[in-house]
Amino acid sequence: MEKAIRNFLSQESAGGILLLVAVALAMLMANSPLSGLYQGFLGTDVQVKIGELDIHKPLILWINDGLMAVFFLLIGLEVKRELLEGALSSVAQASLPTFAAIGGMLVPAGVYLLFNYGDPVTQAGWAIPAATDIAFALGIMALLGSRVPVSLKVFLLALAIIDDLGVIVIIALFYSTDLSTISLVIASLAIAGLVGLNRKGVTSLLPYSILGLILWVAVLKSGVHATLAGVIIAFCIPLRAKDGSSPSEGLEHSLHPWSTFFILPVFAFANAGVYVGNMNLETLISPVPVGIALGLMLGKPIGVMVFSYIAVKLKLAQLPDGVGWKQIAPVAAMCGIGFTMSMFIASLAFEHADPMYGDLARLGTLIGSIMAALVGYFWLSKVLPNKGV
């Protein structure tokens, strides 16, 4: 278990650096003479036509709907593994991160709504600060190496996975519109086929891939966000074959470097380019960026800590072995790194609104996430022993 987590985190730390480079490059291009090239590239129309099927979208939507579906496939595989065999496989193991994740979603959303209540346009962004970027948060923790107890790493991993599960539910319930009955019927048939493959013990990934592609197209056309197709596919792929091998884990290990070193950096590059030339102090302190930044910087750690404390005091959960509240607190701060996940929800929340709102949301996400990363890192570094645990 410890070796697997260390391998996971070693990739995440390198991926975190690459994410920062992608964000910096996007901001540089969006605020330089290259801005036209940057916007033109992301707006390039890409068309796929097979018979009667015709999909044409700007490149940025192929990234957000296509590449991110693969990312959510990976998230789904991780969630399934942890639920069946890992850090969430028993009530005792799952209790604390579950309560922490719930608090870490409710309180930031409440903070955002405090600043945006009454505005029907900006209220749609309530879920933006509720997300945690699992890759970036774990990457920041990985910078502290062996000083971090394994049980603390598992706690953050489990919390982030439950948080991702919550985001999946939020997308399905609140950011799916204009539903198409025909597409939903096709999607349902594809899901039935995937479940049937699982029930029959099929371990070859090819039939899952074919039905998964059909499901993705159907969900894309249905009005439900296409990334949910990735999660459904993941839950249908068997965790264990009869010979003891794991098709699910094999795919997870194959996808992980692609997600870390390609999908998330590309997503960050495509979505983090905020033009700040027309922004002033009044813009920076407007309800959207302030609500998101404070939701991430304050709402997240307060929610995680308060709900965790209540759960422990009521004996509904217990602290991880060898970990006290002084270690949990900085990890709670790290949960405020919303970054790519918050930007993704922002792209859904303000998809049909004035582009200004999307820029403000991304700006608030960047400010809040960077502050959460800095506070979490230096705080955890201060409370941990100097030698490996």
Swiss-Prot record:
Question: What is the purpose of this protein?
Answer: Na(+)/H(+) antiporter that extrudes sodium in exchange for external protons.
Where it sits in the cell: the answer is: Cell inner membrane
**Any Pfam family the entry gives:** Na_H_antiport_1
Any single GO BP term: regulation of pH
Q: Identify its protein family.
A: Belongs to the NhaA Na(+)/H(+) (TC 2.A.33) antiporter family.
Task: State the annotated membrane topology for this chain.
Answer: Multi-pass membrane protein
Name of this chain's protein: Na(+)/H(+) antiporter NhaA
One annotated GO molecular function: sodium:proton antiporter activity
Q: What is catalysed by this protein? A: Na(+)(in) + 2 H(+)(out) = Na(+)(out) + 2 H(+)(in)
The record lists the organism as Shewanella baltica (strain OS155 / ATCC BAA-1091)
The record, for NCBIfam families, names: NhaA, PRK09560.1, PRK09561.1
One CC-aspect GO term:
plasma membrane
Which keywords has UniProt assigned to this entry?
A: Antiport, Cell inner membrane, Cell membrane, Ion transport, Membrane, Sodium, Sodium transport, Transmembrane, Transmembrane helix, Transport
List membrane-spanning regions: 14-34, 59-79, 95-115, 124-144, 154-174, 177-197, 213-233, 257-277, 292-312, 328-348, 363-383
Q: Which gene encodes it?
A: nhaA
